Amino acid sequence: MENNDIQFTSLQMRTDKYGWASIQYANKKQAILYTRNGGVEWDVVNPLNSIVLFAYPINARSSWAYGLTKTNDDLLPAIFYTVNRGERWSEFILPVEEDWEKSTDVQVQLHATNMDSIWIVLSRKLASNKFEHNLYYLKTKGKVWKVIKNISISDSISGITFINDLIGFISLQKHYETSTVFKTINGGESWHPIKDIPSLEGINNGTTMAYKAIYKNNLLVIPTKMNDDIFLMNYSFDKGNSWHISNETINTSKVAVSFFSSYYGWVINSENGGVYQIIKKGAKWIKVSSNPLLKNVFCLHFFNRRKGWACNKKEIFTTKDRGITWKKVVYKINNIDKLV
């Protein structure tokens, strides 16, 4: 199998040496990759006897993954977890009740900040073009599950983020007549649209996408792409009770976003390779470079104030000077035939 047959779906380096990536093969099979030498070599570290659908790294050693586990000739939805760089995985079987949740076609969103608990949303598109979503919450100690069936959102979910056990946010891709963000204050039991998120004057109704909310040190950020190909950010400093709109916007239809902390963030305009550093808790955007190498990047992850990584479907790039200069990483994937 050649690298030409695969494409990256995510990349998260956690140190100079160690990091995770996800790839998809032409036959739609997916794999979790791990590197120990700065992205030069990658190993396939999928859980045994599984079909992986979504990976969610936590740190240099630990990661969650969602997929189907093969049990007695049956495929059961499961959450997998590793604390030793993918060498061994353990699993929890989801308490699903509906057949569609056991499919590889299910849409998946995950959120976790540690290895103690995780949120899972399973979604499907109905014939009416609306969506059905089931929410699962797992506390690993005691294997405690909370299940909320058919939550009251009918649009396509682009991300879920919880800032504590009770307060969470779901971001949507939808027609911009009502809110693109929903909030819960009771652990997901009920969800309500946030109606006071500011927008730009003169924006026409159309399809708007709110990206997965980012929460860093009491700064809550919701990156948003308007239908007129205008990218902006909404900020909250009080857990989503009040909101502010970014002073800056970018005219683009494609971006990659990363926040290392509440004080340092980055945006790449994936149409032209422009790199912006965000400081002062979102108040100031500084264009630090423009690099055609970065056209079409969709994943971006900074693990400190200076060092970051980005990828497009085929290539990996890294910076050591807060995004001013970027270098392409020549890589190889070992045992890639495991995907067949």
Question: What do the predicted segments below correspond to?
Answer:
Residues 1-340:
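Extracellular glycan-interacting surfaces
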